[in-house]
């Protein structure tokens, strides 16, 4: 019944799924964590399969110093399902990025409940480090993570 809109700069808004709605609600604001020039920014959002019960949602964003991809879990505030708790961030994985482009960003839950993360090759024209073919790096891969394990951190 709701529509969530991500902005590359690091904000997520929520709207009621009604054509007459004219107001937006800030669901999450992590602009202070996100670098958002070029192909970087807040790049993905996925809701846990048990979201209605646990309020968990996941985001993929690029962070500065050092430049890296971050996939984190957040939770909605206990008193309002239209507001994410910025202080609830639990970082699942961080991967350094050698360049400012080709960072990937898509995240989605599969039918078995695992979180799939599309990692770009780390960038620049022609993949100069050959990350897309290098089996020793997580760049240029699709990661599959069971976020319900005890550690749920890599």
Show which residues each predicted segment covers.
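Secondary-structure boundary elements
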Residues: 109-116, 145-154
